[in-house]
Structure formats: structure tokens, C-alpha cells
Design a protein with these regions (language model features):
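Condensing-enzyme catalytic core mediating Claisen C-C bond formation in acyl metabolism
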Residues: 1-72, 172-235, 239-242, 318, ...
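A contiguous, well-structured pocket-lining segment that forms one wall/lid of small-molecule binding clefts
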Residues: 69, 222-285
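Claisen-condensing/thiolase-fold acyl-transfer catalytic domains that form or cleave C-C bonds
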Residues: 79, 105-107, 119-124, 133-153, ...
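Short beta-strand segments
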Residues: 8, 102, 132, 156-162, ...
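Flexible, glycine-rich active-site loops centered on histidine and acidic residues
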Residues: 152-181
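Conserved beta-ketoacyl condensing-enzyme motif
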Residues: 4, 52-58, 63-133, 247-267, ...
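Short, well-ordered amphipathic alpha-helical segments that serve as non-catalytic structural scaffolds
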Residues: 30, 74-89, 232-248, 296-303
Length: 332
């Protein structure tokens, strides 16, 4: 049985609220619009408020240099999340035999984020590698480990990290500044020891013909075909919930659900389309923004203390690629 033994997450240090982005940075769409259309109150950045105010992040390469000087990078966020996951699992870094990492906004082309995180945490030699499926990377990591279950070392550390604000355009007519936050999540996974969550195999797939619908150029800003991606995400997430429910014989109204933390409003659309109760839907986007692949696992880390043994969680996520994934977790 594959299980998650420890969960951790870490957010960047500098808070950006809606009033600051509208009144000082000058984003044209005001807080009322953000509340009704996105449902996001605040997010966190590896950058400084002064930098965003003065430059609008016109040159993402300058943002990367600033983040490095401030000591906050996708790797440092991932390492912070990893430390929390290791502590909850009650194991030492030296016991980890494999690190699998996702990083949507790497500051280094090479080496892998997995090796940089391993070095930061004091993890020894192993077949550490990056497995990137953008926002759906948590599902991809769980699927990969389920496929490899018999060959896994005793403890695996998975991390999902990104600093999207370094690739965000804060020009006045762009709403991306309201959406993105920086953060990371981590999970200690084992196929030999029971933990906090039982992991059932995930389903993952992609739509290559839509590969450029969500894109970050090597040294450019994030951009996407917003309306098309939103419509696809709502439709596909509903399909994925249904697929998992059918596979495992579940009534979706009796389980917990969690979706990609893209926006509060998008998740409401999904719940309304399927007639699912909001009280059994887990989310945190309103208080930290969209932190990409770390979104769902950070929700799990925050929600687990209020869940009880036997509770089941169906998760589904759609992201760049276009890539998607879904699966089932059970509280142990």
C-alpha cells in the first residue's frame, strides 16, 4: 500500500493584498471585481512590494536576480516544505532514498530541482529527478509512485514548487497579478509503512494540441488563453471526478473533493455543475492565491487535522500541457 506519511507546505514571505495591487500598483480591475470573479483575497511573493510597485516586473530576469538576493527561490520554498513533511513523518533527511520534484519556474535550467532540494535538506545520493506536469504534477507524482511501488526505496520525498510572481506581468490591464502566489508543498511517501493518507492509483493524461494554451517563455511572462482554458478546466475536472467515483464505487456527495486552486469562483462553477456540497469541498486559494502544483497538496496539509479516519478525498486538477490528473486518497 502506498501512503503519505508527512505533508508540508511553505509560502513566500511578502504578502500582496488586493488593495495594494489596485491602489498602489495600479491594476485596473478593482477589489470588488477580484472578490466576485476570482475570490482571492491575498497571495504571497518572493519579490518585494517596492520592486513590483516600481517596475511592474517588466523584466522577469530582474525578478529572478532579486529573489535570489532575498534568499527566496522555488528551491528554498521546496526545501522549507520538505522539512515540514519530514518532521511530520518523523524521519530524517538521510533516510530518503528518492526525491521527485516539480518546478514550473526554475531559476536554473540545470541541475534538477530535485538535486538542489536534496542538497538543501542533506539528503544523500539517489536517483533524484524532476517530473514536471505543471499544475497537475502532484497527481503525476502519485501515479508514478504507484506504478513503481514494488521498486521504491523505503521513503520518497515529492515536492511541488513555483514562484509565478517572478513571471507575472503587473501592467494595469493584466489580471494575472491577482491570481498568482508563490509557494511549495511536499509529501513523504512510503510503500512499506502506513501513514496519514492511503494513495490509490491516479489517472493522468494530456492534450498536446493545446500545448501552448498556457505558456511561460524561457525569459518571459506567463500567458494563457484564459477563457478557453477556464472552460476546459471546468469540463475536465467534472469528468475526472466522475471517473474516479466510477472506478472506486463512490458517491461524490459523500466524499470530500479538492480541485486545482486556480480561483474560488472556478471551483464554485464546478461544484454547481455537479450539484456537490460546498461544505465538503476543500480549498485555500482565497488566502494564498494560485500556487500551481502546490495548491492541492497544500490544501491537504491544511485540512488533514479536521478530517477523520476513513474519510475519502477525490482530487482532480487541470493545468498547462494541457495536462490533467485525478485520484483518490483515504485518511488512515
Amino acid at each position: 500500500m502506498l501512503s503519505i506519511m508527512g505533508l508540508g507546505f511553505e509560502l513566500a514571505q511578502t504578502e500582496l493584498d488586493n488593495d495594494f495591487l489596485h491602489r498602489e500598483v495600479g491594476l485596473a480591475l478593482g477589489p470588488d471585481w477580484v472578490k466576485s470573479r476570482l475570490g482571492i483575497n491575498k497571495r504571497f511573493t518572493v519579490l518585494s512590494r517596492d520592486y513590483i510597485l516600481q517596475t511592474k516586473n517588466a523584466q522577469p530576469n530582474e525578478a529572478i536576480l532579486l529573489a535570489r538576493r532575498r534568499g527566496q527561490t522555488p528551491v528554498s520554498l521546496a526545501a522549507g516544505a520538505g522539512r515540514r513533511a519530514l518532521a511530520q513523518a518523523g524521519i530524517k533527511a538521510q533516510q530518503v532514498g528518492l526525491v521527485i520534484a516539480n518546478n514550473d519556474t526554475p531559476f536554473e535550467t540545470i541541475p534538477s530541482t530535485a538535486n538542489l532540494v536534496a542538497r538543501s535538506l542533506g539528503i544523500g545520493s539517489g536517483p533524484h529527478c524532476d517530473v514536471n506536469a505543471s499544475c497537475s504534477s502532484f497527481a503525476r507524482h502519485m501515479q508514478l509512485l504507484a506504478d513503481m511501488e514494488g521498486a521504491l526505496p523505503e521513503f520518497v520525498l515529492c515536492v511541488q514548487t513555483a514562484a509565478y510572481t517572478t513571471r507575472t506581468d503587473y501592467a494595469s490591464r493584466c489580471m494575472d497579478g491577482y491570481i498568482w502566489g508563490d509557494g511549495a508543498a511536499a509529501q513523504v511517501v512510503s510503500a512499506r509503512r502506513a501513514g496519514l493518507l492511503k494513495v490509490s492509483p491516479a489517472v493522468c493524461a494530456t492534450k498536446p494540441e493545446a500545448a501552448e494554451d498556457v505558456l511561460i517563455d524561457a525569459a518571459g511572462h506567463f500567458r494563457q488563453k484564459g477563457a478557453a482554458v477556464k472552460a476546459f478546466s471546468i469540463q475536465k475536472t467534472g469528468e475526472l471526478y466522475g471517473l474516479v467515483a466510477q472506478r472506486y464505487g463512490l458517491d461524490l456527495k459523500s466524499v470530500y473533493t479538492v480541485a486545482h486552486q486556480a480561483s474560488h469562483a472556478l471551483q464554485n462553477n464546478i461544484l454547481q455543475n455537479l450539484g456537490l456540497p460546498e461544505c465538503r469541498h476543500l480549498r485555500n486559494v482565497q488566502e494564498q492565491g494560485n500556487i500551481a502544483a502546490a495548491g492541492i497538496p497544500s490544501v491537504l496539509a491544511q485540512s488533514l487535522p479536521r478530517l477523520k479516519t476513513g474519510d475519502r478525498i477525490v482530487y482532480a486538477v487541470v493545468g498547462s500541457g494541457l495536462a490533467w490528473g485525478a485520484g483518490l486518497l483515504e485518511v488512515l
